[in-house]
């Protein structure tokens, strides 16, 4: 039903019923085409058009539609139809271009994902499939690959505030721009910090549409390894704010943006820096209990049903590809998308991922036994969403 009825609007409004399913493409081997084809394998979390959930692969699918309709790559189309007319001369899709520019920001992150204070330098996120010389962008490109500057992004903001017009040329119809900027899918609560200044939450097409101190606010944030961005507009004030930072998963962009907007509006009492700091502290403090709730209650004094060597092998899932389990020196190791982590025995045939830098750190996975008495599958909540539950990875026979 969904395949027969889904529209471009559904893709851009994140209302297909699919949860994020991000883990398979982060450092994954898929091409852009394979990413989109993989949508057919994904388990939905909700019925079609009943629930909002951000879904990056759906945005990639919309980008692929541009390629199918124009005969150009998404990168070629955006460069010719957006970057060049707007004069966005320092915007690119390629990590190589950034690293070749002496005036570029270095990406940073926290020392570990569980530490709130401190920083460490990290590498740029670069897909193995990215090839600037051949004009091939990252597979996930349409969902988040543009690297830019404040000055270039302000040109993009001005273009939006001018309803698709640059100079005397209407690049996108005013009607289309208004469709993108209006509420298309209601949200029951804010994505991040609840605050008294905001009382309406929805999603347009590629934009969050909210109210802020009585004004319609159109905004969108983004995070990718070592960088955070927030673009915000108050259309009735012809006000646009772009906040960029070279720090991973930073909420400072919101505190800074709301403070700037308040000063322009003449509003007082926001105290955004302290409020966001308190919110982030609460988020971090809640993480251990959230992880505990995701895992089964541990049963002490148990042991695996098989020798560790019997668990080793390759396990495959249609959506997520391969998990490789290795037995080394009396320990099991878990490898997914080139990242290897140690497994600790949890209870019976359930093991826990022990790697503070791993996406799945602290999560448990369980091995299933087939009718032949052999280890035959892994059951793992890799979708990171209780609406989907566990995915089954079947052991590949040699």
Where do the model's predicted regions map?
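Short, surface-exposed loop or secondary-structure junction motifs
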Residues: 1-225, 230
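Peripheral terminal and inter-domain segments
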Residues: 187, 196, 258-398
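Structural motif
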Residues: 212, 234-236, 328, 347
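Short, well-ordered beta-strand elements
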Residues: 219-220, 230-233, 237-246, 377-380
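Contiguous hydrophobic, core-forming segments of folded domains
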Residues: 235-269
């Amino acid at each position: 039903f969904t395949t027969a009825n889904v529209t471009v609007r559904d893709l851009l409004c994140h209302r297909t019923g699919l949860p994020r399913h991000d883990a398979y493409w982060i450092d994954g081997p898929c091409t852009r085409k394979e990413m989109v084809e993989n949508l057919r394998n994904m388990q939905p979390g909700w019925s079609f058009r009943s629930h909002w959930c951000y879904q990056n692969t759906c945005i990639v699918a919309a980008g692929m539609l541009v390629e199918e309709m124009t005969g150009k790559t998404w990168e070629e189309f955006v460069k010719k139809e957006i970057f060049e007319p707007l004069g966005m001369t320092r915007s690119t899709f390629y990590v190589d271009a950034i690293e070749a520019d002496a005036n570029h920001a270095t990406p940073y992150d926290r020392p570990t994902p569980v530490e709130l204070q401190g920083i460490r330098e990290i590498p740029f996120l670069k897909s193995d499939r990215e090839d600037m010389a051949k004009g091939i962008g990252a597979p996930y490109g349409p969902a988040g690959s543009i690297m830019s500057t404040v000055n270039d992004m302000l040109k993009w903001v001005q273009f939006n505030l001018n309803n698709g017009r640059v100079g005397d040329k209407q690049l996108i119809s005013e009607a289309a721009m208004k469709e993108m900027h209006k509420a298309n899918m209601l949200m029951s609560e804010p994505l991040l910090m609840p605050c008294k200044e905001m009382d309406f939450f929805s999603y347009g097409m590629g934009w969050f549409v909210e109210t802020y101190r009585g004004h319609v606010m159109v905004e969108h944030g983004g995070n990718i390894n070592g960088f955070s961005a927030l673009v915000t507009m108050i259309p009735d004030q012809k006000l646009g704010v772009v906040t960029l930072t070279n720090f991973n998963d930073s909420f400072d962009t919101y505190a800074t943006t709301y403070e700037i907007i308040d000063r322009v509006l003449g509003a007082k009492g926001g105290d955004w820096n302290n409020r966001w700091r308190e919110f982030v502290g609460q988020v971090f403090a809640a993480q251990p209990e959230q992880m505990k709730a995701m895992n089964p209650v541990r049963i002490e004094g148990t042991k695996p049903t098989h020798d560790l060597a019997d668990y080793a092998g390759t396990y495959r899932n249609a959506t997520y590809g391969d998990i490789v389990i290795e037995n080394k020196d009396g320990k099991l190791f878990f490898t997914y998308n080139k990242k290897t982590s140690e497994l600790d025995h949890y209870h019976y045939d359930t093991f826990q991922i022990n790697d503070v830098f791993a996406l799945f750190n602290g999560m448990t996975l369980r091995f299933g036994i087939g009718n032949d008495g052999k280890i035959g599958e892994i059951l793992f909540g890799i979708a990171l969403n209780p609406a989907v539950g566990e995915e089954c990875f079947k052991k590949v026979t040699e």
